[in-house]
Amino acid sequence: MGGIRLDTKQLKQDIIDYAYTIGIDSIGFTTADPFDELKQKLEAYHANGYASGFEESDIALRTEPKLSLPTARSIIAIAVGYPNKLKGAPKSVRGDRRGLFARASWGQDYHTIMRKRLDMLAAFIESKVPDVEIKSMVDTGVLSDRAVAERAGLGFVGRNGFVINPKLGTWTYLGEMLVSIPFEPDDPLLDSCGDCTICVDRCPTSALVGNGQLNSQKCISFLTQTKGYMPDQYRYKIGNRLYGCDTCQQVCPKNRGINTEQDDIILEPEILKPRLVPLLRMSNKEFKQTYGHLAGAWRGKKPIQRNAILALAHFNEVDAIPELKKVATTDERPLIRATAYWAIGQILGEEARDFINANYDQEDAEVQNEMIKGLDTRRE
C-alpha cells in the first residue's frame, strides 16, 4: 500500500471508534482465511435437504473469502441491534383480526440500513488508506454473515442458529466487509447455550435440528416467504404470521431485557401489525406504497395475502367470510382463490358446501383440490 508502513493497530482502533459514531453497535475483525468448518456443515446441510434456496448455492463462494476479493487480508464484521418491542401495538380482536411482520422487517429495509453504515465505514477507511480494496456484503452476499460474525468475536451461534451478542442478544442485523489490510484478528467469544434447549423445544414446526442448524424447509420464517401452496401440515402452525417468525428468539433467555432502538428504524404499529381483511383488498400499487419499505415485502404481496387468508382460518374468523368469498370468486390468481376456498371450508364447515359446490365446476383442478380439502380436512 504505497510502500508506507501502515500502523494497523491504530487504524483498527480508529475504525472501532468511528463505527460507534455511525450507529454500529458491535464490530469485530477476523482473517480472510477459508471457513473450513463451515464448508463441512454446508455440505451436510445441502445433503440433508435443509437449504432454503434463498442463499448462495456455491459452497466455495460461501467459505472462501478471497474468491470474492482476491486481495482480501481481513474481514470486518458489524452488528446493528434492532428493536423487538412494539409500543402502541393494536390488539387483534374478533371482527378486526391482525397479522404480524417479524421484527427483523420492522422499519426501513435492513439492507438499506446496513449498506448505509458499511458505505460510511468504507469511506472512512478509504480516507485513511486511499488504495485500500474493499468489498461489503449484507445478507444477500455470498459469505455467511453468521460464520463471519462468530469468528470475528461478535458472539456465538446459539442452538437457534442466531449469533448471540452479549449486549444485543440475537436481535441484530449482520454485515461484513472484506478489506486488503492485515488487521490483528479478534478472538471468538467463548460462550454457549449450555444445557438450554428452550428454542428447540418451542419451535412450532421442530425446524431446529441441533448444534445451531436449521431445516429451512420446516422453518416458518422460510415458509411464509414461499410463493406456492402452504404445505397442509403447516397451515395452522403459522398462526397470524405474515412474514417471518420470531419464536426461537422470543423464548431465548439470552434476550431477556434487551431492546435496542435506532434513530433510522421508525416503527409503525398499524403497518407492522396490519388488519387482515383490508390487506386482501390491496392492489399492487397500494401494497408497494404501504409495505414497500419493509424487508418483509421483498417477495411481493402474494405470499403476504396467502398468509393473511391462512391467519383468518387460524382465527376461525367468521366475520371475514364475505371478503373471503369475494376473493375466492374474483381474484385472478389460482393460489389465492384456492387458499380462500380452503379457508372458507375450514371456517364454515358444512355451511360452506353449497357455496363451494356452486363454484366448483368453473375452477381448475388445483383450485378444486383445495375446495374439497377445505371441507374434508376441517380442524375440529
Swiss-Prot record:
It is an enzyme of class 1 (oxidoreductase). Binds 2 [4Fe-4S] clusters per monomer. [4Fe-4S] cluster 2 binds at residues 203, 219, 245, 248. It comes from the Bacteria. Monomer. Keywords: 4Fe-4S, Cytoplasm, Iron, Iron-sulfur, Metal-binding, Oxidoreductase, Queuosine biosynthesis, Repeat, tRNA processing. One of its GO terms (cellular component) is cytoplasm. Its EC number is 1.17.99.6. Pathway: tRNA modification; tRNA-queuosine biosynthesis. Residues 181-213, 234-263 form the 4Fe-4S ferredoxin-type domain. It catalyses: epoxyqueuosine(34) in tRNA + AH2 = queuosine(34) in tRNA + A + H2O. This is Epoxyqueuosine reductase. Its cofactor is cob(II)alamin; [4Fe-4S] cluster. Catalyzes the conversion of epoxyqueuosine (oQ) to queuosine (Q), which is a hypermodified base found in the wobble positions of tRNA(Asp), tRNA(Asn), tRNA(His) and tRNA(Tyr). Its main location: cytoplasm. GO terms for molecular function: 4 iron, 4 sulfur cluster binding; epoxyqueuosine reductase activity; metal ion binding. The gene is queG. PROSITE patterns: 4FE4S_FER_1, 4FE4S_FER_2. It holds the Pfam family HEAT_2. The active site is at residue 139. SUPFAM superfamilies: 4Fe-4S ferredoxins, ARM repeat. One of its GO terms (biological process) is queuosine biosynthetic process. [4Fe-4S] cluster 1 binds at residues 193, 196, 199, 252. It comes from Staphylococcus aureus (strain NCTC 8325 / PS 47). Belongs to the QueG family. It is found in: Cytoplasm.
